[in-house]
């Protein structure tokens, strides 16, 4: 059965080109279009699409407000189009926080030329998020939706570090069957993720105390223009410190370093971060396998690694190296994943020492390390 898609954009050109690209795939059916957020809500309720592609800047109602309403009234996987700018990154992160599953850069030049790479990427994203966890609405903010704001309104983040997680609590998935972890003198916590990762990392890291005793490295598949904004966002929400990693940074307790987009991050035995150019032969920049592999070489059995929601199998080979060195590997459970791909690869390869729900992982990190 074809994946039913609703295309939402105030640009007639972009709406038409996205519809043409998707309709050229016989396994995808464009069932409707909308020009603003209000129309998107009405069409989502009427057409019940499998996936919605959504612009942000639109008249009547912006895309983020529309996503919040859709997640409350008819939870549907949403693919956001975003600009590759710092401000575009902040807006995209707001959309993911509201419940969108994934995003794509909005590039008029690329889409007008209609290169094969754009067509392939768009169709792959649509197919992937159509299979995402239909409980996705439970991972959006649970606060009541406010009256629609003008499209130009942007809610700024609070400037003070909160004493507790800033997100409203979402419904908690059933507890996993893995036992609580045993305490061990870990020298490093390494967390890798992809689709669904921005919200998942926020949920995990906001549970950690400011005096968390182990250094943390984060590998999130994300463009270069987005990682700095994402690190800044996490730093404002968490009690630990979070920053985008730079070459020469030193690991230290209570600090999480986020791998920069478009590059690779490695760690040496002295706790020094090495940032390397992204290898074009690798599918992911940053790549979880690269960072996990360097951690295995430098820290032996003293690494606690966690693989969260995401498509594909990045992290599996790095986790294999960590296991061979005696380190610990956790995977997020299927029920709480947006996309059960990367964690599934860990589980199927028999590399997982424990499988926990998203809401358990932060608590268990504290139990294992503090």
Swiss-Prot record:
Transmembrane segments: none annotated. Residues 150-183 are annotated as: Disordered. Keywords: Chemotaxis, Cytoplasm, Hydrolase, Phosphoprotein. The active site is at 194, 221, 314. Pfam families: CheB_methylest, Response_reg. This is Protein-glutamate methylesterase/protein-glutamine glutaminase of group 1 operon. It catalyses: [protein]-L-glutamate 5-O-methyl ester + H2O = L-glutamyl-[protein] + methanol + H(+); L-glutaminyl-[protein] + H2O = L-glutamyl-[protein] + NH4(+). Phosphorylated by CheA. Phosphorylation of the N-terminal regulatory domain activates the methylesterase activity. Disulfide bonds: none annotated. GO terms for molecular function: phosphorelay response regulator activity; protein-glutamate methylesterase activity; protein-glutamine glutaminase activity. Its EC number is 3.1.1.61, 3.5.1.44. Residues 4-121 form the Response regulatory domain. The modification 4-aspartylphosphate is found at residue 55. Residues 179-370 form the CheB-type methylesterase domain. Its main location: cytoplasm. P.putida strain KT2440 does not have a chemotaxis group 2 operon. Belongs to the CheB family. InterPro entries: CheB-like, CheB_C, CheY-like_superfamily, Sig_transdc_resp-reg_Me-estase, Sig_transdc_resp-reg_receiver. Contains a C-terminal catalytic domain, and an N-terminal region which modulates catalytic activity. It is found in: Cytoplasm. One of its GO terms (cellular component) is cytoplasm. Involved in chemotaxis. Part of a chemotaxis signal transduction system that modulates chemotaxis in response to various stimuli. Catalyzes the demethylation of specific methylglutamate residues introduced into the chemoreceptors (methyl-accepting chemotaxis proteins or MCP) by CheR. Also mediates the irreversible deamidation of specific glutamine residues to glutamic acid. Residues 150-180 have a biased composition (Low complexity). Coiled coil: none annotated. GO terms for biological process: chemotaxis.
């Amino acid at each position: 059965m074809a994946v039913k898609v609703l295309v939402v954009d105030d640009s007639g050109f972009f709406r038409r080109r996205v519809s043409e690209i998707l309709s050229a795939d016989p396994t995808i059916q464009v069932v409707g279009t909308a020009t603003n957020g209000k129309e998107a809500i009405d069409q989502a309720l009427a057409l019940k699409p499998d996936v919605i592609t959504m612009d942000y800047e639109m008249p009547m109602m912006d895309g983020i407000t529309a996503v919040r309403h859709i997640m409350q009234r008819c939870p549907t996987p949403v693919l956001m189009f975003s600009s590759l700018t710092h401000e575009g990154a902040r807006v995209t992160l707001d959309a993911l926080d509201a419940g969108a599953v994934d995003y794509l850069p909005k590039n008029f030049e690329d889409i007008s030329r209609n290169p094969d790479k754009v067509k392939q990427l768009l169709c792959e994203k649509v197919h992937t998020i159509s299979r995402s966890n239909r409980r996705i609405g439970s991972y959006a903010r649970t606060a009541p939706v406010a009256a629609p704001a003008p499209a130009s309104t942007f809610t700024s983040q609070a400037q003070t570090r909160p004493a507790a997680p800033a997100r409203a609590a979402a419904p908690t998935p059933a507890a996993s069957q893995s036992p609580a972890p045993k305490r061990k003198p870990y020298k490093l916590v390494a967390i890798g993720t992809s689709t669904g990762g921005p919200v998942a990392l926020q949920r995990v890291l906001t549970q950690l105390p400011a005096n968390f005793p182990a250094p943390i490295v984060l590998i999130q598949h994300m463009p270069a223009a987005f990682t700095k904004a994402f690190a800044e966002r996490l730093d404002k929400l968490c009690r630990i410190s979070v920053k985008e990693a730079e070459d020469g940074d030193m690991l230290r307790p209570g600090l999480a370093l986020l791998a920069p987009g478009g590059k690779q991050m490695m760690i040496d035995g002295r706790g020094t971060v090495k940032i390397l150019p992204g290898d074009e032969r690798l599918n992911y920049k940053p790549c979880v396998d690269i960072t996990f592999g360097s951690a295995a070489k430098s820290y032996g059995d003293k690494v606690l690694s966690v693989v969260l929601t995401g498509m594909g199998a990045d992290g599996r080979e790095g986790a294999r190296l960590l296991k061979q060195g005696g380190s610990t590997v956790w995977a997020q459970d299927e029920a709480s994943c947006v996309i059960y791909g990367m964690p599934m690869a860990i589980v199927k390869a028999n590399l997982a020492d424990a499988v926990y729900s998203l809401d358990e992982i932060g608590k268990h990190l504290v139990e294992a390390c503090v």
